[in-house]
Amino acid sequence: MDDLHGDLRGIIEHLDHVQNLGIDVLYMTPIFKSYSSHKYDIIDYYQIDPSFGTTEDLRELVQEAHKRGMKIVMDAVFNHTGREFFAFEDIMEKGEKSKYLDWYYIEKFPLESERGEIPNYKCFGYYGGMPKLNLKNPEVEKFFTDVACYWIKECDIDGWRMDVGDESSHYFWKN
């Protein structure tokens, strides 16, 4: 266990024990593709990080949890992304000509930030590896609404926990 975390198969294998503890809701911290250990700097919201398993593993986990009367709630990290997320990469490549420019809060060009430095764009916790999204942008809102609906339909998850809800736009959550 060098990576300091388990995986979806491990949760499936221990569901009976978890149920015997009286737990009826499992809250999953981010499990989407990311290069960090904490996974809050997501680069692909439609792919389970391979270190945790596959979409089929998540589907099986939800099915097995439901058989035991348990629910699965996933972490909705919709306030910020990783720098390697497609929209932010496009901005880094095309600068002011990027069609995703309004997806983030860019203060000036060229973008300047290595991990650990305070960047010239808004980000979560002043950490350049997690650029902050503009949730007032209808395209961003649609993207993340589609993400939320996808996982509900694809794997039958029961709900979402909204990460950084206090920093997210009320406009976004109302819609």
Q: Which residues does each PLM region occupy?
A:
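Active-site and adjacent substrate-binding regions of carbohydrate-active enzymes
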Residues: 1-175
